[in-house]
Amino acid sequence: RDSSGQVAGIQTVNANGAPGASATVRIRGIGSMSSSNAPLYVVDGVPYDGDMSSINPQDIESLSVLKDAAANSIYGARGANGVILITTKSAKTEKAKVTFDAKWGSNSRMVPQYDVIGTAEYYETQYKTLYNSKIYTGSSKAEAYNYADKTLLDAKNGGLGYLVYTVPDGEKLIGNNFKLNPNAKLGYSDGKYYYTPDDWYDEVFSSNFRQEYNVNISGRSDKLNYYASVGYLNDSGIIQNSAYKRYTGRAKVDYQAKEWLKVGTNIAYTYSDSQAPDYQDGDSWGSSANLFYVSNTIAPIYPLYVRNADGSIAINPN
């Protein structure tokens, strides 16, 4: 995203959000609905078709953008969507120079969670909804209260079908004042399992550590110019089981063998391991696989864990 805001008209979007995911770059807008609108990347004079996140930013000396006729004149049709020229580092001083840098940081969700109703308010709101549905159709208050009492936990008839409160025998969960019974205790056991709601937001999102290390050596003489580097990145995401690890290496050597002969090599290696939960199931963004969707829409009465009758989290032996 370094080029965003530095070149007029360039757009960069990272719609995925997963650690290590490459951004979508548009230099000349959208010119086709069926063909690719991605620019051509050229690294040290060679067209590059790989993932941009595979290039260690610490190895980049400069980045420039061609977006006008110059792109077409040099690269033809391949430059129709613009060209991004990347030049990697080389030696600047004659003496051998070793550079090491380490970076530490933290990844956190900066957008606060919505202010949502709690467990008690959710039951109260559902009860009031059932009551009003009968009043709206002409039923008496007594009939409406009776309907709400019977239907609140009846999933087949529009109720919640789920109880996470222990209510004394003979008493109702919600009174005729539409408030939770003060004698109701959060947490319910049927003898086999214990039911209590969890904070899905706190369970799904967390602040995690990010660390990056890079070391390079470079130098030059009248005939030799060399640059070599290795890098390691461990970037943990803000949701559980999301992370990106990258190992990079680069060796760039130029040698003036004769006045008329110059030989060189530029080799790069990248190994990356990316982990991220599914953000959609098929074509449905509102699926249970989308943790962002679920954590923001699930009712505050449902648990995240299966618990034993004593309240401890059940562990699957398999």
Regions found by a protein language model. Name each.
Residues A23, N37, E94-V98, Q211, ...:
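Outer-envelope beta-barrel architecture signal
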Residues L66, T87-K89, N216-R220, S229, ...:
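Transmembrane beta-barrel domains of outer membrane proteins
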Residues D44, L66-D68, T196-Y201, L233-S236, ...:
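Extracytoplasmic loops and strand-loop junctions of Gram-negative outer membrane beta-barrel proteins
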Residues T93-P197, S207, G237-S242, T248, ...:
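Surface-exposed loop/interface segments of Gram-negative outer-membrane beta-barrel transport/assembly proteins
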Residues A80, F209-Y213, A243-Y247:
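Residues that define the transmembrane beta-barrel architecture of outer-membrane proteins
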Residues S22-A69, D101, Y188, K192, ...:
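Periplasmic plug
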Residues S206-D222, G231-L233:
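Outer-membrane beta-barrel transmembrane strands
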Residues D2-D44, S62, N72-K92:
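Extracytoplasmic beta-strand/coil segments of soluble accessory domains associated
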